[in-house]
A protein has these predicted regions:
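Class I S-adenosyl-L-methionine-dependent methyltransferase catalytic core
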Residues: 1-63, 67-357
Length: 357
């Protein structure tokens, strides 16, 4: 087959979305539930390791995510819709310049998704790993345990995003409250909840921005999220989206980020924790420092920092970050800020700041 024929046959098949059939989804869900999460938790170094269990399940409910812009980068959907780019990407698979070399008839949908995500100049929106979220809930939140006399705690996820933390909450067995303004995302989250949520636990999903969600006093056992990065991922055009509603970074910091942190403070029980996963990027060079300062202004005490181990691609030299792909050594040199990463070769880390009320 020549490249045009390969291109045309894929276009005829349609975009390689994740499967949506019940059997496939149930298999992935069971892998997530049966995964031994304690293997991810390194309490000595305060590191949460990485595993992708359950991530594909979240993505299978979020087909719109393939077309969401990150800064000026191209989306995977834009590559798919451009004959020249798509042909180039297919050529990389056929010639083995990008991945393992494969003949046309052996190329899978998974190969296609990988190529579309990693095509030069392309960035796909990020999702939180369900296993990492569940591990955080394991560390910070009580579960239903007749033996220990505890009942399942309630967590709030201010920026639900694409379902990684919701699936983590389901896997960990905690009650979950979530907020997010994006309509198609919200619809996907409702389906995840309806299909996989435990009947005896509560999942309250709210389509609104976290700055407008006022929890009841002392109603929360843990607040945990990865807030949006001002103006980086254009999640949707809803007027409630934080970077549409607050058009300057100062306004966004004050009215969105600080207000969300204040809402968390109001809702948390005394002695309980807020955990925020943020990282400095080229677009926002002081996101970490600003987040810690704002939390302190609200009244929190910064008691700890846990580290999320992020994916390093092929051979540990290329690293996927919120900024796009970079090499590990470059990433180490690039990091500007006061929160020094654990020095473990072949791995990249992002902080999750822990604040106590």
């Amino acid at each position: 087959m020549n490249i045009k024929e390969v291109h045309d046959s894929w276009k005829e098949k349609g975009f390689p979305y994740y499967p949506t059939d019940t059997k496939w989804r149930n298999d992935i869900f069971n892998q997530l539930i049966n995964f031994k999460r304690d293997t991810l938790i390194d309490r000595k170094n305060k590191i949460i390791g990485q595993s992708a269990h359950g991530l594909n399940l979240a993505w299978s409910y979020m087909p719109h995510a393939w077309g969401i812009k990150c800064g000026k980068m191209k989306t995977p959907m834009e590559i798919w819709e451009d004959e020249e780019h798509l042909s180039k990407g297919l050529n990389k698979i056929l010639s083995g310049t990008f991945f393992m070399k494969k003949p046309a008839h052996m190329i899978t949908e998974s190969d296609m998704r990988s190529m579309l995500r990693r095509y030069s100049g392309t960035q796909m929106v990020s999702n939180f790993r369900p296993t990492a979220a569940a591990a955080m809930y394991d560390i910070f939140v009580d579960k239903d345990s007749p033996l220990e006399g505890t009942t399942a705690g309630t967590v709030w996820d201010p920026s639900m995003g694409y379902g990684g933390r919701l699936l983590g909450a389901i896997a960990a067995g905690v009650n979950y409250i979530g907020t997010d303004p994006c309509i198609p995302t919200y619809e996907g989250l409702e389906k995840i909840r309806d299909e996989y949520g435990h009947k005896h636990l509560k999942y309250s999903l709210n389509r609104q921005g976290s700055e407008t969600f006022i929890p009841e006093d002392e109603s929360l056992d843990f607040v945990f999220t990865s807030p949006p990065y001002f103006g980086w991922e254009a999640y949707g055009d809803e007027p409630e989206q934080s970077s549409i509603k607050f058009s300057t970074s100062d306004m966004w910091k004050e009215k969105f980020l600080k207000q969300t942190i204040a809402n968390a403070y109001k809702g948390l029980k005394k002695g309980k924790y807020l955990a925020l996963n943020v990282a400095n990027t080229k677009q926002y060079k002081t996101f970490e420092e600003d987040t810690v300062d704002l939390a302190k202004e609200v009244g929190f005490e910064h008691t700890d920092t846990w580290w999320l181990s992020l994916s390093t691609q092929q051979g540990g030299s290329a690293v996927s970050t919120l900024d796009g792909d970079t090499t590990e050594t470059k990433q180490k040199q690039q990091y500007m800020g006061k929160y020094t990463r654990p020095n473990i070769s072949g791995r990249k880390f992002e902080p999750t700041f822990i604040f106590k009320k």
